[in-house]
Amino acid sequence: MTKRPSLPSYRDVELGPDELTSAASGLPVKVDRLSSGWLPSRIRQIQSPGKWALDLPEFHCAFRAVGDFSPSSIALVSVQRACGSTICGIPLKDDMVVTIPAGTTVTATIQPGLRYAAAVVPTAIWAEIQALSTGMIEEQAADHPSAVRLATSHAQAIRNQIEPMADCFAAASTDPIQLEHPPLMLVEYLGALADARAVSDRHEPGITQSVGRHLRQARAAEDFIHAHIQEEIPIVRLCKEIGVSRRQMEYAFRATFGVSPLEFIRALRLNEARRQLTTARASGLSVTRVAMEVGITHLGRFAASYRSLFGESPKETIHRARPS
């Protein structure tokens, strides 16, 4: 990991895939890698824990993330480069703003190149900003994220505010008092977002009936794979359980996760094996036992696939992990 200067309420770092569990403020996540190639992702975070945050990540790896968002805050994610990623089942597009309400269980498929700015504030503060900017408060279901795509002119105006605002907050981060509560620049930025959202199309762009169906199919299949990870899961069985053809399943997985069903199952098994291997020294588990626990029967192939995805052998993961 290469670090740039970090301060108590500010960090600007480059992280590998294993370190991305805290890349989103207010949202600790479980990360599963989806492909072997990666470069360090740049993560900039300015925050006053529990009060507000501004995240500016640029990801350079493919992964699946799942986590529960803060029960008292709302996140407004302004997408700069989408690169085929999805958040909460919403296919992202450039210049889209995704609103994630408090307490949402967030699922995301991140593709290399995704870049966004996420502002996190208490729900009550966002309601006040909406009321002042638009004269109305938008009711949001606790578990229902939404998205609008901004007009080009509004999107450019929003983008122009982000970097200067982040630089200003970084400079002020040596004085915790200045950043304890949402700064005026952040409030003005959120006001501009509220205005832009109010005049944008309020339907959820990209969520056509067919796209929504494919997302539901892929997520149902993902749940089934998790529940039966110790078992053999041929694609025929998966299709039968979900009630779709092999072609439909293939399309649903590539549209949602960017990989085939077989590649997804293999990656999920390898990621689960990695989690178990990091505690294997304390629990006394062997590489063979861990592989069997996640439904892997070909140990030679397992070692090669594991090294390809994580850059080290299963035994190296065990030895590198700290004993409890």
Language model: regions and residue ranges:
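Short, conserved beta-strand element in jelly-roll/cupin
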Residues: 68-84
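Short hydrophobic/aromatic patch on the recognition helix
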Residues: 249, 253, 301-302, 306
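Conserved short histidine dyad/triad with adjacent acidic residue
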Residues: 36-40, 44, 48-69
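Alpha-helical DNA-recognition elements
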Residues: 255-256, 308-309, 320
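Short acidic (Asp/Glu) patches
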Residues: 58-63, 79-83, 100-104
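Alpha-helical bundle regulatory/interaction domains
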Residues: 2-34, 38, 84-229, 234-236, ...
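A short, basic/aromatic helix-end/turn motif that makes direct DNA contacts
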Residues: 254, 293-297, 307
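An amphipathic alpha-helix adjacent to DNA-recognition modules
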Residues: 263-266, 270
